[in-house]
Amino acid sequence: MNPLLVRQAIEYAVLLCDKYNDRIVITINGSGGMGNSTEIRPYCDEGFCFDPSLNAIIVTRTEGKTFIDTDSIKTIHCYKQKI
């Protein structure tokens, strides 16, 4: 996926997190089929950011960090979590 689009999608997801008090789920689907997806849940203390120098999204969880290369990303979805 185009790095500029990825950056805009992540910036929009950050705005949604602020608007809905971190109650969103972000799903990133890669190029490996249906089983190759990553879910980010900010309300579970999972962080995310776009690093332009690495051309990747960095997902931070309690067990460590995951790097997702923007070239492998096919879709990014944001969902509002129901309370």
Which positions does each model-derived feature cover?
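A general, composition-driven signal for non-globular sequence regions
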Residues: M1-N2, V59, K74
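Short glycine-rich, low-complexity segments
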Residues: M1-N36, K82-I83
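A broad structural signal for short, well-ordered beta-strand segments within beta-sheet-rich domains
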Residues: N21, V25, C44-D45, I73
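Acidic, low-complexity, intrinsically disordered interaction modules
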Residues: T27-T66
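Short acidic, Gly/Pro-enriched loop/turn segments at secondary-structure junctions
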Residues: T62-E63, H77-I83
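Phosphoinositide-dependent membrane-docking surfaces
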Residues: D69-C78
